[in-house]
Amino acid sequence: MKTKVQLSFMMFVEWFIWGAWFVPLWLWLSKSGFTAGEIGWSYACTAIAAILSPILVGSLTDRFFAAQKVLAVLMFAGAVLMYFAAQQTQFSTFFPLLLAYSLTYMPTIALTNSIAFANVDDVEADFPRIRVMGTIGWIASGLACGFLPQMLGYSDISDTNIPLLMTAASSALLGVFALFLPNTPPKSSGKLDFKVMLGLDALILLRDKNFLVFFFCSFLFAMPLAFYYIFANGYLTEVGMKNATGWMTLGQFSEIFFMLALPFFTKRFGIKKVLLLGLLTAAIRYGFFVYGGAEQYFTYALLFLGILLHGVSYDFYYVTAYIYVDKKAPAHMRTAAQGLITLCCQGFGSLLGYRLGGVMMEKMFAYKEPVNGLTFNWAGMWTFGAIMIAVIAVLFMLFFRESDKEITAIEVVDGDAALTQGEVK
């Protein structure tokens, strides 16, 4: 099997796994009697795990283990944990299992990126074409959990534990497949010490001012972005969109197009402008949600435009961010660097976003009595998110000074960070 085909299938299953349980989880837990706070903590599992595990796994993989073997072990463990999580109906038993599962899954985002980066010739041209299969995998999970069962004459499975069982089976599949991926050996022979164990060696990258600004803005952006993941399904359903779980895959359809176009945008406009465009489209998306609704064609169309812009925003910011990190980090630290950005975005940023969003919805935007059939002031929530992102975009535009034509690579020598000027191929 050709390497690019293998990497593409790896990405497909990797993101099918996450989409299968993450999007419909709210519906199943709500039906099972979990409180809003318990559901919020359940969603926060991925963020907590992203804080604890990816940078550690990345540092160890950079030095001691072949990346594809680590991926296989984590996927097999995740399959077992998710299977047992799907059997639980009480928060006290469900939460620990979901958290343990998340600890096995979140490092694999950085691992799959690193495996792909290590086995392609042209990162900017090849990676988006491989990564787009992850988007297709996420779409496939939405269709499998949303439209497909009803098209086949079955009842809706979005509010059952079947998506979690699909996740377990898919994890086992990727665990087996990972054993046949191209060998991706460690690129460093550094010794095992406490600093490496905690992944603290990757923090040296923050000495570079541009990387620090990028890291800080990525962290801030992850907070309002989390509002979409936890609230969009409930919002779209409450304002009258039928089968919102299925329709939300439109965001991934737009992601396919713009991800394939990403090499053109990065080469034509440079990484800074593409990252900035990702921020701006996210703010516009929330603006559409502020005025969206099902009462007339125009407002209903705004809902779909908002969903479509999610794919644009994700591609232009996060996929470009992965490419930027791979260019910026030295070869022996790239997996740890990918873990660092996962820690920043899916970890601390998302965790704070989930908690901030949950608290604000309960304390500021929850109606005591339904208003026009709505239980929350959704317009207020989306307005807050749009303003946050707009402020982040301004900060990024002012302080991120990386050249559009060449990247300042960070060269780590004897534990110190030195800067090497020149374009990174």
Regions found by a protein language model. Give the residues of each.
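Hydrophobic core of transmembrane alpha-helices in multi-pass small-molecule transporters
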Residues: 12, 81-82, 91-111, 115, ...
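Structural signature of the two symmetry-related core transmembrane helices
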Residues: 69-83, 273-288
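Multi-pass alpha-helical transporter architecture, strongest
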Residues: 85-86, 171-182, 347, 376-414, ...
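A membrane-interface helix-boundary motif in multi-pass transporters
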Residues: 147-169, 359-389
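Juxtamembrane intracellular "pre-TM" segments in multi-pass secondary transporters
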Residues: 1, 181-216, 418-422
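Helix-to-loop junctions at the C-terminal end of transmembrane segments
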Residues: 52-66, 149-153, 258-271, 361
